Swiss-Prot record:
It comes from Saccharomyces cerevisiae (strain ATCC 204508 / S288c). GO terms for molecular function: DNA-binding transcription activator activity, RNA polymerase II-specific; DNA-binding transcription factor activity, RNA polymerase II-specific; RNA polymerase II cis-regulatory region sequence-specific DNA binding; sequence-specific DNA binding; zinc ion binding. The lineage of its organism: Eukaryota, Fungi, Dikarya, Ascomycota, Saccharomycotina. This is Sterol regulatory element-binding protein ECM22. The modification Phosphoserine is found at S431, S445, S464. Residues 353-366, 401-432, 441-450, 457-472 have a biased composition (Polar residues). Transcription factor involved in sterol uptake and regulation of sterol biosynthesis. Binds to sterol regulatory elements (SRE) with the consensus sequence 5'-TCGTATA-3' present in ERG2 and ERG3 promoters and regulates transcription of ERG2 and ERG3 in response to sterol levels. Seems to be involved in activation of DAN2 and DAN3 cell wall mannoproteins.
Amino acid sequence: MTSDDGNAGQEREKDAELIEVGGKKVSKTSTGKRKFHNKSKTGCDNCKRRRVKCDEGKPFCKKCTNMKLDCVYSPIQPRRRKDSSSSKFASAVHDRVGKKNLSDNAIMLQQQQQQLHHQQEQQFRQQQQVQLQQQLLPHVGTDEQSNSPNSVPPSVSNNMENLLLPHLLASLVNNTSNSTNSSANGAEAHNNITQTAPSSMINNNHPNMALPGNSPLSIPITPSFQSTAMNLSSSLNGLLSPGRLNSVTNGLQQPQLQQQNQQIPQQQGTQSPFSNIPFDQLAQLNKMGLNFNMKSFNTLFPYGAANGMASEFQELFGLGKFATSNNRAIKVSTAEEALANMQQEQEDKNKQFTKNPLDNTKTDAVNSGNNPLNGNENKVTASDILSHNKNLIIDNTGLTISPPHTLSKPSIDQNIASPSTGVSNVTSTKSLLSIPDNRTALGNSPTLKTSPMGDLLSNSEALSPRSSNSHTQQQSSPHSNASSASRLVPELVGLSRKSNLNLIDLKLFHHYCTDVWHTITEAGISGPEVWSTYIPDLAFHFPFLMHTILAFSATHLSRTEAGLDNYVSSHRLEALRLLREAVLEISDDNTDALVASALILILDSLANASSSSPTAWIFHVKGAVTILTAVWPLSETSKFYNLISVDLSDLGEAVINQSNHNNDNDNSNNGDGNNNNTISELVCFDESIADLYPVEIDSPYLITLAYLDKLHREKNQLDFMLRVFSFPALLDRTFLALLMTGDLGAMRIMRSYYTLLRGYTTEIKDKVWFLDSVSQVLPQDVDEYSGGGGMHMMLDFLGGGLPSMTTTNFSAFM
């Protein structure tokens, strides 16, 4: 080794900072891998990637040829010199600051543009509203033709709500005191309204109407203003939104607003006292026989029906022309929701039957000492109840198990439902089903074993088979002796298996056609031709009606025969399930079926009032009434048109009968006192509420007292039962609001109604069988009602937990 080589080695050792480890010299910074390789900077790409020496043969190097690789020579790129880290950091900071400044400038510019656009838009809107007000002023006169909604131009009517609402509210607030300080501008009216929000309602004329809560009320809220505020809730929400305050309080509008505020009290001086009544109450009074002119009031409230007006019975009281397009959808949704709650409650009740079937059996209604039944005969499982609903349609060739909704108006002989033909016509109808006669497979079917007859079938094997003649004799005299009466249901179960017939349901349908329908007509609900022929025939077209009939018939038969409680529950549950589907598809074809089902459900709820909690029947009655609400209005071709559309809407007829003479002289007699403001035809019928008479025309109790007066006058009419139990569903929203907020006057009126209801049920319970049960759960005094007395009882009656009547939804129209 030469000296030069030795010097070079020493230099390399110094450069690499070699240290000696284990007798070997290694680099201090070595990682254990080769730091350098023999690859050529000008070699092919494959050799560079593999870090091997390339012979640089072109176009193919030797290594790529041996390995059968594509030899590629990429052009040599000059290496970039790295900039110092300090300069890079400085440039990055500079770029960041520049971008931030640019973004800030852009944001400021955008905000300025938005503000400018908003100001321009606001000025344009103000100018447009000033023009609209100038066009509107001639239409606020007293001329009837110019005041009619049809005479207002479309451009004006679209903004009428925004322009008139603040002044209407201001005039209504100051009307009772005849204050001369009503010339405040739009901003002052708005401040007064917002400062006196009804967290507590105070009535000067009715001190008992104060609500709990502390609120700096600077303006007394009269009954008329209270109900008006409810009916115009949606308009207030839109008016008091932040985006619309500027357009109300702008200085350009103040001269016009002051001019209108001065004109409106002057016009009120010449108006009839009827103009203070909310729109919904006014229309109801007009239906009852109050023949005053409504054109001036329609001008003030052109959108009354669309903004919060009580919509449940608009068509019932003659407000169909004001109904909105979504009125039916709202009522259908409410009915479907109520039926869903009823269905859920019925399912929970059926689960209780499953857990403890013997304790829930209604054996006390059947002379349990004379008609004992074995425990096994009464025991029915949950699967029995569910699958029983599928066994309804019967043919003389066999039995099928199919969902009830498959029945969609089959061609049926018109003589099926005739009371004289009884069950024989039903079993001889071959157009209902097409079933293969496979009795062996049917007998072994697991579905049949889980029917309501399933558990009883094993116990019925010991029953001796009987001929059809002996069975007919057994049905003709079910009460011949205690032993035969107690064995009727198990015997029918056994015969159903032997003959492949569901004789229980046949027996229930026959029982309705021969016995039950008489009890409905005797209660004054429609005529015999409806319930004896029309409804049974209609039940074959609509399964929900069939299940409703069978449930009601089972309830009636269970008073004399034991073992039918589970049939009542299962048929009612299936009827509710199918009604939920049917109420979403209301048509002229199924209207009568829905009305009949609702009426039967009401009667069935009354008949089973004592079998559950004391308030459960109220929940079911209210839910059934929602079906009647959903099908409104009924067509004149309906069998129930005279019963529902005329009788129920006639509750207040002739109660209020102001003469046309008073209407013609409203302007001249306006200052004569309160003679024109009271209803002389309403006579006190209960001394406990005598202080509420005479009833003023703007009283929040007017409609309710008119209904009760009508009920007392026509107590002996045949249809009184349906009227008295449907009364809570007909309450107007103003009275409902007072009742739900604890108004003492409203509670006293409902106590009077309860006294009427209690006295009526006690009087006729021996004549009408389905009122006997409800008379047992009604306390002697309404204050003894579980939960706190009259208000709680009536709140149950008015909703009982229905979502449509909860306080959450109630706040929507407060």
